[in-house]
């Protein structure tokens, strides 16, 4: 088994948390860092980690040097470098040279200075895999959620909801959960207050969500919904459900980050490759200060290993 870890934005916490996790022996399977050797080396020197960098498995792409760093800042150069690491990792995964990818955070604004249409890792990696039926899963020990839509405005996210998209998200969620949970049971959150209360506060539940749930049941999936959004996450937290299908980005992100901010893992499901990610950003404000937590990286790495093994 070999896990590829992309370095993330060089101006952020990515290099630091890779080094710290390696130093503390938190990554329990062979891995290769896809990034820039000189940046990793400089971070090691700056933070006095005294790690033998040459003992690490680093695929040096030679894109950025320490002299080009702008620590804690948005820059076109770092945005370009960070997305090149991702492209190389996907290429390696598609060629079966690595078994999974763990991505460290990029800065969307920095990436857009080179790729103006970039909306996030999830969509970018799916496009490289030429996959249209995919979505984002967030997972922690306390809660698992998936999303019908991800990086859309709230207005557009509501318009994006259809029976087919809700059904596909339920199916993707089920197919992923059953790899590591026996007989998973899925909840589907409503969109509107009280899940619309029979059309009193919107009809998306009647027109799209309930028909998708019924179709999933007919196809053998143990699923319930639509369930009022203000209670469904508590029920899942109490283990009444294995995971919750959410209608839009923040509906799923808020409860998971509230319950387990550092332990969350982002997984792109529906791809022909395995990709997990830390569930935090570049943290420019604390970059290269030696204080960034490695917990999300540890959890993302463990989840990638779990998916490879299952």
What do these predicted ranges mean?
Residues 138-160, 164-168:
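Ligand-binding beta-strand-loop-alpha-helix segment within the catalytic cores
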Residues 128-143, 269-285:
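Short, flexible loop segments at boundaries between secondary-structure elements
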Residues 1-121, 163-247, 251-266, 271-274, ...:
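Contiguous, glycine/small-aliphatic-enriched amphipathic segments in soluble metabolic enzymes
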